[in-house]
């Protein structure tokens, strides 16, 4: 197993970031890695509950998460993070904080798939007009141009996605 790294999963709400990150973290743990898990929803309930969704607040959300990932990394943890990270400027911030230790993983799913999954009911809230600035619908999501890896979750299983990630991120780099 390689040294500790940060695996930063990003994509639209409902793309499967948290589900895939959880499963990937379990696989890493099964192979002896000490994993520290960071999730955007969880941070917004606690550490980042003072932040809204303005451009400045989104950047601060990502910056804080990247700084937390760096602290865990310095303690020898492998970090698995899942954050929407909607714009390239956010992803550049992650790269600037974490440098060579970060693997950016774009979790790609069509907007229709995301709406179908909508476990939090957010897309319904957007359609009702209750949420104004929603990434991918009424707020921008910039398709990545420098991602390290793209994984599509449309029409496939979590297990298949984890196997693909494992092969590309772990096995092929031994």
What residue spans do the PLM features occupy?
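The conserved Walker
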Residues: 13
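Conserved lysine of the Walker
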Residues: 17
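Hydrophobic anchor at the beta1->P-loop junction of P-loop NTPases
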Residues: 9
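Small-molecule kinase domains that catalyze NTP-dependent phosphoryl transfer to phosphate-bearing small molecules
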Residues: 108-111, 116-164, 171-174
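ATP-dependent NMP and nucleoside kinases share a basic, alpha-helical "lid"
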Residues: 46, 50-52, 69-127, 133
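Conserved beta-strand scaffold positions in the cores of enzyme catalytic domains, especially
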Residues: 37, 102-106, 148-150
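Conserved substrate/cofactor phosphate-moiety recognition/catalytic segment
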Residues: 21-67
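Extreme N-terminal, non-catalytic leader segments
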Residues: 1-6
């Amino acid at each position: 197993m390689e040294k500790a790294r940060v695996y930063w999963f990003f994509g639209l709400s409902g793309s499967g970031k948290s589900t895939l990150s959880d499963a990937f973290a379990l696989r890493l743990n099964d192979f002896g890695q000490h994993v520290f898990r960071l999730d955007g929803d969880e941070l917004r309930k606690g550490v980042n509950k003072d932040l809204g969704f303005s451009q400045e607040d989104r950047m601060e959300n990502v910056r804080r998460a990247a700084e937390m990932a760096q602290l865990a990394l310095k303690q020898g943890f492998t970090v698995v993070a899942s954050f929407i990270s909607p714009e390239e400027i956010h992803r550049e911030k992650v790269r600037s904080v974490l440098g060579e230790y970060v693997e950016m993983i774009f979790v790609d799913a069509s907007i229709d798939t995301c709406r179908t999954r909508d476990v939090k009911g957010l897309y319904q809230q957007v359609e009702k007009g209750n949420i104004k600035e929603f990434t991918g619908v009424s707020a921008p999501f910039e398709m990545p141009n420098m991602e390290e890896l793209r994984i599509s979750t449309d029409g496939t299983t979590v297990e298949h996605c984890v196997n693909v990630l494992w092969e590309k991120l772990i096995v092929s780099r031994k």
